[in-house]
Regions:
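Acidic/aromatic-lined carbohydrate-recognition and catalytic surfaces
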Residues: 1-110, 114, 127-182
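Hydrophobic residues within beta-strands of alpha/beta enzymes
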Residues: 120-122
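Short, small-residue-rich loop/turn micro-motifs
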Residues: 124-129, 204-206
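Noncatalytic carbohydrate-binding groove/subsite architecture in carbohydrate-active enzymes
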Residues: 179-212
Length: 212
């Protein structure tokens, strides 16, 4: 219960321990109230909280591959359209281009900050901005699906700076972004000395060190 959480948080702080929460806002569960409402009707006020597209010639809207293999699109018979999921089909991607999505995400973050948490570890935060129009990716020889190219999207820094203004800058927080596919130079934009986005990032290059 939330009472259990409050008691745990107070106990941690009494012992000089800080609590950093996992923040997953590139996508939600397909059981989240937003998605349940979004899929219910094309006219739902939550429809544009996610990416819904019609199929092309009886196939997916584009050739993007999911990080978990297969198409990044799943057909939903309720409205005869597909929704985007860069990961599992149980994890539909949020549409960060929609200001209402950003407002609700920031409101949720502020709520947790007011509870007294000490930071956020942000899951795949470098992927929240998709290419305008969701164009087909470049197919590699022999491939069926293409890399969606959603890392370091056109508005990712704009959205993180907005997050900083609306939430992060108002609290004493440690923030770390999971940024797969982000170069060292690009990482400086996410966690620069100007403090306009995140405290730090972690990358995955170290995994390949033994490969030479």
């Amino acid at each position: 219960t939330m009472e259990d959480f409050d008691r745990m948080l107070q106990g941690m702080h009494d012992r000089g321990i800080r609590l950093v929460m996992d923040l997953v806002v590139n996508h939600t569960s397909d059981e989240h109230p937003w998605f349940i409402e979004s899929r219910s009707s094309k006219d739902s006020p939550y429809r544009d909280y996610y990416f819904w597209r019609e199929g092309k010639d009886g196939k997916e809207p584009n050739n993007w591959v999911s990080c978990f293999s297969g198409s990044a699109w799943k057909y939903d018979e309720t409205t005869d359209m597909y929704y985007l999921h860069l990961f599992s089909s149980k994890q539909p991607d949020l549409n960060w281009d929609n200001p209402a999505v950003r407002k609700d995400v920031f409101s949720m973050m502020n709520w947790w900050c007011e509870k007294g948490i000490d930071g956020f570890r942000m899951d795949v935060i470098s992927m929240i901005s998709k290419k305008p129009g969701l164009p087909d990716g470049k197919l590699q020889p022999g491939a069926v699906y293409a890399d969606p190219g959603c890392v370091n999207g056109p508005h990712v820094h704009e959205y993180l700076q907005e997050m900083n203004r609306e939430v992060l800058s108002h609290y004493d927080l440690m923030t770390v972004g999971e940024c797969a596919g982000v170069t060292i130079e690009e990482a400086k934009k996410y966690a620069g000395a100007d403090g306009k986005e995140l405290s730090m990032v972690f990358q995955f290059e170290h995994i390949d060190l033994n490969d030479g």
